[in-house]
Amino acid sequence: MEDFSYVVVGAGTAGCVVATRLSQDADVRVLLLEAGGSERARGMTMPNAWPDNLGSAADWANATTEQAEAGPVAFPRGRGLGGSGAINAMVHVRGHRAVYDGWAASGAPGWGFSDLLPCFQRSEQAAGRDPALRGIGGPVRVGPVPGE
């Protein structure tokens, strides 16, 4: 049996980032576990085909509990390399500034928008966007859908 310094459970967006950062230390061994596979279905590579992901092998196919007026509501969650980020139509959405500032105001110092902005910028590669708000050298390419 192999020994690992860290075990990261879930190869979704956050799990992959955490595992990558931890593994940058040559003295650290990281195991990244994921329940699903690494296959890339059409709905994962073509934004307009995202509905193909729903109910597929890449979707845990979760649903809410029974709702009073609507029955259960589908709650798709990604199963596989990339997690829910692999089945969400390639949409990259940052929270609103007010949400982060609300966290800081509620007693979470260091979690305000201006505190987190440098972290967001380090993660993004958003060429042609406002450099005061977007990064240009990060690993996550962010931009409009090609051809739109």
Regions found by a protein language model. Give the residues of each.
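N-terminal redox-cofactor-binding region of secreted/periplasmic oxidoreductases
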Residues: 1-148
